[in-house]
Regions:
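N-terminal strand-loop element at the rim of the active site
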Residues: 7-15, 27-83
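Conserved acidic donor-binding segment of nucleotide-sugar-dependent glycosyltransferases
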Residues: 319-320, 324-331, 338-345
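A conserved mid-protein helix/loop that constitutes part of the nucleotide-sugar donor-binding site
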Residues: 18-26, 204-230, 244-250, 292
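Aromatic "clamp/platform" in nucleotide-sugar-dependent glycosyltransferases that forms part
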Residues: 267, 286
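Short hydrophobic beta-strand element within catalytic cores of glycosyltransferases
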Residues: 40, 303-307
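A short, active-site helix/loop in glycosyltransferases that binds the activated sugar's phosphate group
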Residues: 154-179
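Short beta-strand->alpha-helix junction loop in the catalytic core
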Residues: 136-137, 163-164, 182-192, 211, ...
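Short His-centered aromatic/hydrophobic patch
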Residues: 88-91, 109-115, 133
Length: 354
């Protein structure tokens, strides 16, 4: 009988972690001879990826018949916090019951990690808990207390970058023997080739992508674009994603008459077709771990301009070799590097190094 591996990763809006979960589960299905993977579809959030999950023969465990996902707000800090509380209340007992009844070999925790970690503190399980660091962890007071207690009973903690691994080591919140470096899984080149073929209804643009949050720093990009178009009003920038700062970004675009230069295109299921056609990819994040879209841009051989965000981008991008790096949140340095980045001859050299 195969050992069961459960994935816990509830989300309010699609992010790169969702695809990482699917790819990880698929890897277990494909290469784990004695294991089978299950994604816990807590409130119907993974129905967005139903076709891909079915195609990859990954099993789904549904918690509720009612589609919570359609009704939970995710835009705005207060509303997203309310949604988190709702998820916590409706999730803690069903997850406890699933683990006690089904007794999977492993529970891999990606998002909303506090819920299963609290269960790990309060109860004993036959299941081995694995915490996957998804995004750079801000060790605030609550998280430090929670991790200090919960990680005593954790099986492993996996980190997507060496910088994060060292950061967790230095925190001394978990025994070093339980730490592992594990890079995020990516789809096969065959799949990328197929996805790149899809048509995109835009031409001659730069692309940015991610949740519209403070972390992604898209307002900074909008301010930079305002300066860029003073020299060339035909420049076009697409931002793919949804999130709590959408209203602020739209307001800035409207107030500065940037509607013809900056387009918010919402969440994009297939980012590869957009990356393939883009003049370049721009990452303005304040921090990333690892910065999954940088890897996707590299696969598409799309030139990259990235902030020197820690821990992922600074580890992935080597300045003027496989991309360009600017000082995070520094408009002058961004504009200087964008001018070089915008030079076709410079970009051709970067493409050769991907």
């Amino acid at each position: 009988m195969k050992k069961k591996v459960y994935y816990w990763s509830p989300f309010l809006s699609p992010i790169a972690t969702c695809k990482a979960v699917i790819n990880s589960a698929f890897s277990i299905e494909k290469f784990g001879n004695n294991h089978e993977s299950y994604i816990l579809n807590f409130f119907n959030e993974f129905s967005l990826f139903r076709n891909e999950i079915k195609k990859k023969n990954i099993k789904i465990i549904n918690f509720y018949k009612f589609n919570f996902f359609r009704h939970l707000p995710y835009e705005g800090k207060i509303r997203s916090r309310i949604s988190f509380i709702i998820l916590f209340i409706f999730g803690i007992f069903p997850l406890f019951k699933k683990l006690k009844t089904n007794k999977p070999e492993y529970l891999i925790i990606h998002l909303i990690s506090s819920l299963p970690l609290i269960l790990l503190i309060l109860f004993k399980f036959e299941t081995k808990f694995i915490l996957r660091i998804s995004g750079f962890p801000k060790l605030n007071f609550f998280r430090k207390i929670l991790w200090k207690k919960a990680l005593k009973n954790i099986h492993y903690v996996t980190c997507p970058t060496e910088n994060t691994l060292n950061y967790i080591k230095q925190s001394k919140l978990v025994d070093e023997s339980k730490l592992r470096l594990l890079y995020d899984p990516i789809i096969t080149f065959k799949e990328v080739i197929e996805k790149k073929k899809e048509l995109v209804n835009f031409e001659n643009y730069y692309l940015s992508a991610g949740r519209l949050t403070k972390q992604k720093n898209f307002l900074f990009l909008c301010k930079a674009v305002k300066e860029i178009i003073k020299k060339d009003s035909n420049k076009k920038f697409l931002i793919a994603g949804n999130g709590e700062e959408k209203g602020k970004i739209l307001k800035f675009i409207k107030n500065n008459k940037l509607e013809n230069n900056i387009l918010l295109i919402g969440y994009v299921d297939n980012i590869f077709s957009y990356l393939n056609k883009a003049k370049g990819f721009i990452l303005t994040s304040l921090w990333e771990d690892p910065g999954f879209v940088l890897i996707e841009a590299g696969i598409c051989r799309t030139p990259v301009l990235s902030s020197d965000a820690w821990p992922g981008p600074i580890e992935i991008i080597k300045d003027k070799y496989n991309g360009y790096i600017y000082k995070s949140n520094d408009i002058k340095d961004f504009l200087k590097n964008f001018n070089i980045f915008d030079d076709k001859r410079e970009k051709n050299q970067i493409i050769l190094n991907h």
